[in-house]
Swiss-Prot record:
GO biological process assignments: proteolysis
GO CC terms in record: cytoplasm
Compositional bias segments (type: Basic and acidic residues): 10-20
Enzyme class: hydrolase
Protein name: Methionine aminopeptidase 2
Organism (species): Neurospora crassa (strain ATCC 24698 / 74-OR23-1A / CBS 708.71 / DSM 1257 / FGSC 987)
E.C. numbers: 3.4.11.18
Positions that bind a divalent metal cation 1: D210, D221, E418
Amino acid sequence: MAAQAAPAEELSKLSVDETKPAPAAANGNDSDAESGDEEAEEGAAAPAAGAAKKKKKRKPKKKKKAPTSQSEPPRVLVSQLFPNNQYPKGEEVEYVNDNLNRVTNEEKRHLDNLNQEFLTDYRHAAEVHRQVRQWAQKSIKPGQTLTEIAENIEDSVRALTGHSGLEEGDALIAGMGFPTGLSINHCAAHYTPNAGNKMVLQEDDVMKVDFGVHVNGRIVDSAFTVAFNPRYDPLLEAVKAATNAGIKEAGIDVRVGDIGAAIQEVMESYEVEINGQMLPVKSIRNLNGHTINHYSIHGTKSVPIVKSNDQTKMEEGDVFAIETFGSTGNGYVHEEGEVSHYAKRGDAAKVDLRLSSAKSLLNVITKNFGTLPFCRRYIDRLGQDKYLLGLNNLVSQGIVEAYPPLVDKKGSYTAQYEHTILLRPTVKEVISRGDDF
């Protein structure tokens, strides 16, 4: 930016008086008296010049421009990239059967407009998820520890929402809606490293990356799978296609059992060749999609990923996580391994806790996570230690739910893809949809 011109009044004070006659000279030389006068004038002019220098205006500092793109790793607040809370919409998909009625119905459109705060929070959370996961897909490489990968994702989510979660109650405003699951190979879900975990991602691993982002309790739950060996591509393609089939089938008044049938048909049309053997891709029949409630990752409705007689209907206003899991193994998972995922139950009965460590930890959980899922690393970063006995007591009392890792048979490979959808009055919005999947 160019320096601004000084005001005319300032310049008039500092300029030499051009109307005053110059002193006479004799034979080209000044007289002694004239010389003395000149010296006096020069002496007077010197401070004036100094004053001019002092009064010279400094160049105004250039204003920092607001960022227009995301950094790598992601650290720019998403709210700065989208002024006035104008976050991108998800993919809007028309309802198949009664779409015309819903789009043209004035009452339905009015209901849609009433949900602006709800939609703004969801779209904000979805944009954070998109930006973080798109960076994660580029940055995750063999040789990284799972702890490094998880913390990179979580630090990015906290930076983009503007809530570090270190002050009491801060994580309840915005941040992680579900701990970063990094489930490898035959482990399908609910694995994240606890403190001290040294596990390293290998070239031949198939890793599910499942994490949630929330803004004001509106949780966006979405997952993808990372594999570096192209032989696993058909497995990933099967699960991605099955998830999209479930999303396509979903809608108001649709029975969840019918969605499961559509998912299974697509999923099990794929095969994958591993070590010269053709293996069918199977839907993991005891894993489901689910509704998402305010500050609660699991609602009361489930969406099977196999054909089912479940007659439960999706309803207007529901928020669903449509997630599918495919496996080269049995297509059935069981609990195995050290627990890392937990959540305080919203329906827990009031219990008189006798263990002081359990009472203290419950207070920490309530004030920092509420009913949002958390993992042990989140408790560690709050400065808590020696809490495991108290945590196990809260689980045994039914106050906190533990979510152990879910595994198929050893030697098998599993994949997962997941999106969050909103069943709005006029349209189905795949809120977490991105250019990546």
